[in-house]
Every structure is written in structure tokens, then in C-alpha cells.
Design a protein with these regions (language model features):
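C-terminal, beta-rich DNA-binding module of retroviral/retroelements integrases
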Residues: 264-370
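Mobile-element integrase/transposase regions
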Residues: 48, 84-85, 95-151, 157, ...
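RNase H-like two-metal-ion nuclease catalytic core shared by retroviral integrases
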Residues: 189-190, 195-242, 253-256, 261
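Basic, flexible linker segments flanking DNA-binding modules
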Residues: 28-128, 279-287
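Short, polar/flexible loop-turn hinges at active-site or ligand-entry regions and domain interfaces
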Residues: 61-64, 81, 245-254
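Short, solvent-exposed loop/turn segments at secondary-structure boundaries
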Residues: 66, 161-163, 197-202
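Mobile genetic element proteins and their domesticated derivatives, centered on retroelements
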Residues: 6-7, 17-20, 54, 74, ...
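Double-stranded DNA-binding cores of transcription factors and transposases
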Residues: 1-25
Length: 370
């Protein structure tokens, strides 16, 4: 077989095949380096003596009192011996060449799509409003205040209100926003008592959840102590603090609110194209009154992580989902119309695969709030 035929079969150039043959001439095939890099040693690679010293320090420092033997500790030790010690990256490469790295290299996987735990949001068929609090902002010579923030996932419609953290102060803000911008399909919250209601009683559905249900908005509560699902609103919280709180010195609550309103207006103007391309929002009536004793209708969604027995805790109760799904995320849809809870398995690696794990009977007592 000719060089040209081999090159065509393996998909490389003819010169590459010639170089391989030249390198293997008179040698065993398992001892030959067929890499495409230039032969020889890189000009900026650490010398063999320094590489040997790095390996020795790795072993010595591991047995030292501190027990710190990473690249930073090795470089600190080399600073006392060399005028120009190698960088952290060079030390790590030397350790890798000698097989002295005992940690497994972290596999970085692509992030799942926005709103991946809600199929309609992931497919951009529905909008999601994310709510959160920035707590304990100290006005100069004034009170401690909190900031209620909201950002829509697809349209980036933002709002921020300076207030005292309570359900009574939060409800009018939600109503005013939705009367102006329209109703989303979903509203997402963390598990704060202001949003979810009391945690120490069973079957409790708070006033904010009842507001959403009566407006046809599905409340979504993210899992406690989990990262990722609140990234959109937490990123906006950091942006607001950097661009408003840290840049200006407000002497009163009204002045801070005015500064915030000015920033929100500028932010909305900059993201107008995103809002126009976002999923449609339903109009809300200008005359709405919350009825806390009305029968619960619609769905309430809890994203939770199961325990070692495949159980989840929500609404002050414990539910068995699946023993084959321990320590994993599930989306629990509490359906008040059909008296059941549907539990779907969630995986960040495969966001489109959300199998139904269990359908649990559940009937809410529909007790009015006091």
C-alpha cells in the first residue's frame, strides 16, 4: 500500500504518513511517539533538575505538619531556593507528567438551558418571574431596609422595591408589576416564610401563593440550599448592589427608591428587545381583590431533592417518591383540581428527560387563612 493510499484511508496528509514512517524506522511501534508536535523539548519548559525538585517537595510537604502540598505550597518552598521559581501552572504540568496529581480532573459539562426544570419555560413557550430579597441594607443615619427584586427569565423585565420584608408589603408590589407588565405563566420564589408561608404547620398555602393561584400563575419554589435555579435573580441582585447601592449614598428610603427606579428604567430600556421577543404575558385586570378563603385551584410546584429513602418534604409533610431516585432532584406538581401530586425526575445532564416517578394522592383541607 502506498503512502498516498494510507493517508487517504486514515484522513491525514501524505507528508504526515511519511513523518510517521521516518519516526518508526528501526524502532518498536509501542515505543514511538506519533504526535504532531515538533520533536525535542519546549524552550520554556522547566529543567529536569527543577522538575525533580518539584517531585521531591511534593513528597516532603505531604508529610509535613501543615500537610499542604499543592502547587501554591511547592512554589512557596521554591522561592527560598530559586531566584525565578516556576509558575503554579508550570508546577502542575510537571506534577502531571510524573503522575503525582492525586486529584481527579473536574469534568466541566455545559450548563442546562434556562428554566430547564420547567419544560414550557425551557422551550421558551412560557415566561417565568423570579423573586428574591436583598436583606439588611443600612440607610445612613436611618433604618435597616430590605429590597424586593424581580427579573423575568426570558424578557429580563426587572423591578426593585425598598421595603420592610413582610407579606403585607410584598403583595402590592406583585400586583402592581403584573397589572403593568402582564401575568407570566410561572412565578419563582425561594422558601422564605414571606413567599411560601409558615413551614411548621401541615397543608399551609400562604397568601402569596394564593394570590398567584387566583391569578392563574403557577408558583414555583426552588429547593433549599441548591445552586443554579436562582442564578438569574441573584445575578441581578449583585448588579443592583454594584450599580445603585455602592455608587450612591442615599440618606432616606425615598431617595434610595428614586435612585433604584431610575436604574430600573435604564435597565429596561437596554433590554427592551429581549422583552419584545419573550413569551407573551396575559393582561391582568385593574380591579383585583385577593380572597384568602377561596377554594384552591390550579397547581403549586416544588422542586426538591429526595433523601436517602427517596422521600421529599413539602407542605409540612413527607412524601415517598421512589426508592430508586435517592438524593436526586424531583419536580413535585401539587394539583388541587385533581387532588394529586405528580413527581417528575430531573437531571441536569439530560434536561429533556423528565420521567414521571410517582402520582401521589393528596387532598388539601382548603382551610382559610387566619
Amino acid at each position: 500500500m502506498s503512502f498516498r493510499d494510507v493517508a487517504h484511508e486514515v484522513g491525514v496528509s501524505k507528508s504526515t504518513v511519511e513523518r510517521w514512517v521516518a519516526r518508526t524506522h528501526g524502532q518498536r511501534l509501542d515505543r514511538v511517539d506519533l504526535g504532531n508536535r515538533k520533536p525535542g523539548r519546549a524552550w520554556n519548559r522547566v529543567s529536569w533538575l527543577i522538575e525533580q525538585r518539584i517531585a521531591e517537595l511534593r513528597i516532603q510537604l505531604r508529610k509535613s505538619v501543615l500537610g499542604e502540598y499543592g502547587a501554591k505550597a511547592i512554589r512557596t518552598a521554591l522561592e527560598a531556593e530559586l531566584d525565578r521559581p516556576p509558575s503554579h501552572a508550570a508546577i502542575n504540568r510537571a506534577l502531571a507528567r510524573r503522575g503525582l496529581q492525586d486529584g481527579v480532573r473536574r469534568t466541566r459539562r455545559p450548563a442546562p438551558p434556562k428554566g430547564w426544570y420547567l419544560p414550557d419555560v425551557m422551550a421558551a413557550r412560557a415566561e417565568l418571574d423570579c423573586f428574591d430579597f436583598v436583606e439588611d441594607l443600612k440607610i445612613a443615619d436611618g433604618p435597616l431596609v430590605d429590597l424586593l427584586t424581580v427579573k423575568s427569565l426570558h424578557g429580563s423585565l426587572t423591578d426593585a422595591w425598598v421595603l420592610q420584608r413582610s407579606t403585607e408589603a410584598t403583595l402590592p408590589c406583585l400586583i402592581a408589576r403584573w397589572q403593568r407588565d402582564g401575568l407570566p405563566r410561572y412565578a419563582q420564589f425561594d422558601n422564605d416564610n414571606v413567599f411560601q408561608g409558615a413551614h411548621h404547620h401541615a397543608h399551609v398555602v400562604g397568601r402569596l401563593s394564593r394570590l398567584c393561584l387566583q391569578l392563574g400563575v403557577t408558583p414555583v419554589f426552588v429547593p433549599p440550599l441548591e445552586h443554579g435555579m436562582q442564578n438569574a435573580i441573584e445575578g441581578f441582585n449583585a448588579l443592583w448592589q454594584a450599580k445603585v447601592w455602592q455608587r450612591h449614598r442615599a440618606v432616606s428610603v425615598s431617595e434610595l427608591q428614586a435612585l433604584s427606579d431610575r436604574y430600573i428604567a435604564a435597565h429596561r430600556a437596554r433590554t427592551r428587545t429581549l422583552a419584545e421577543a419573550a413569551p407573551a404575558r396575559r393582561p391582568m385586570s385593574g380591579h383585583f381583590e385577593l380572597k384568602t378563603d377561596a377554594r384552591l385551584r390550579g397547581q403549586l410546584i416544588f422542586v426538591r431533592r429526595t433523601n436517602d429513602a427517596g422521600e421529599v418534604h413539602l407542605l409540612g409533610l413527607r412524601f415517598a417518591v421512589s426508592r430508586t431516585w435517592p438524593h436526586r432532584l424531583v419536580r413535585c406538581e401539587v394539583d388541587f383540581d385533581h387532588d394529586c401530586i405528580r413527581c417528575f425526575g430531573l437531571r441536569r445532564r439530560e434536561p429533556t428527560e423528565q420521567p414521571l416517578l410517582a402520582t401521589l394522592p393528596y387532598q388539601s383541607p382548603n382551610k382559610p387563612l387566619r
